[in-house]
């Protein structure tokens, strides 16, 4: 598969510049996990029985979508109608020529291009699979993407504004995500949970609920992958999955966490390093021990993660 030319010493993300096809080798693992998760979702019936309309937003080289078509089994890739989206004409021209020169080995799989804003692209048609991998925060794109989701589909969202999500840039975190995060050894996990909390709130506006499949902190970015289901009843249960994380909790906080089913009762006098609390617990938002609001449910699905393991 043809790749954009990079300097021999290139590692990780680089600054995007107009007229240059952007390719980040540090995201190779992310693209591999996307292929594996796509296969799992198809095999589990998450994407329906007909044509699967998939969108690779902010695509740059188009490599993620091309890997879907090249690496998934024929019975899966033949059902995929993939659209790659980018503002740069050069990127889309390069992706098209690469796809033509190195087509899928089985000769199936549809690849379309859309030059323009991702928000316009997602609203132009319904989608079963949407990948959002921006240079910075994904916050501006989530609402429009959620509106275009099918009744059952999968969305994957990356964020490289890790300074904000891990609490180092507190003002940016509050502006973009409406939360606070304690900067400690749990900050990256808290950041992923803040992402899931924000996304779940947006989903609920459109009578949808999310079910996390995989959450990853990998080098320079955080990434969450989740199923989106159209369900008013599940959307109404939103607040049951959002709450607070408290570092070095007091006895009464641990007791409340246990009573809410968020903490396993172990007995003894040793308190846990942290605990989760429901949204209605009266925390002091100025307390430096507190992170949130954030997702307090599971951040992944056992079956999805097992499908990515070597036997």
Q: Could you describe each region identified by the protein language model?
A:
Residues 1-311:
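SAM-dependent transferase fold signal centered on methyltransferase-like domains
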């Amino acid at each position: 598969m043809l790749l954009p030319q990079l300097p021999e010493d290139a590692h990780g993300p680089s600054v995007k510049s107009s007229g240059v096809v952007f390719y980040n080798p540090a995201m190779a693992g992310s693209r591999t996990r996307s292929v594996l998760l796509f296969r799992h979702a198809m095999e589990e019936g998450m994407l329906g029985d007909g044509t699967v309309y998939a969108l690779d937003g902010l695509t740059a080289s188009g490599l993620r979508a091309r890997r879907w078509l090249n690496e998934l089994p024929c019975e899966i890739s033949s059902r995929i109608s993939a659209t790659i989206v980018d503002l740069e004409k050069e990127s889309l021209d390069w992706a098209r020529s690469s796809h033509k020169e190195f087509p899928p080995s089985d000769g199936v799989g549809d690849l379309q291009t859309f030059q323009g804003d991702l928000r316009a692209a997602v609203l132009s048609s319904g989608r079963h699979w949407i990948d959002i991998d921006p240079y910075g925060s994904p916050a501006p794109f989530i609402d429009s993407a959620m509106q275009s989701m099918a009744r059952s589909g999968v969305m994957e969202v990356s964020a490289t504004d890790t300074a904000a999500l891990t609490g180092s840039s507190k003002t940016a975190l509050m502006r973009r995500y409406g939360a606070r995060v304690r900067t400690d050894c749990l900050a990256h996990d808290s950041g992923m949970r803040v992402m899931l909390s924000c996304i779940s709130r947006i989903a609920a506006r459109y009578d949808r609920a999310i079910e996390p499949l995989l959450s990853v902190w990998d080098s320079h970015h955080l990434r969450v992958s989740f199923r989106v289901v159209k369900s008013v009843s599940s959307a109404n249960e939103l607040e049951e999955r959002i709450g607070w994380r408290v570092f070095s909790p007091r006895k009464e906080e641990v007791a409340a966490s246990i009573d809410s089913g968020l903490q396993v009762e172990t007995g003894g006098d040793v308190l846990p390093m942290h605990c989760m609390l429901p949204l209605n617990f009266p925390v002091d938002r100025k307390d430096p021990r507190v992170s949130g609001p954030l997702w307090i449910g599971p951040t992944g699905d056992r079956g999805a993660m097992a499908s990515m393991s070597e036997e």
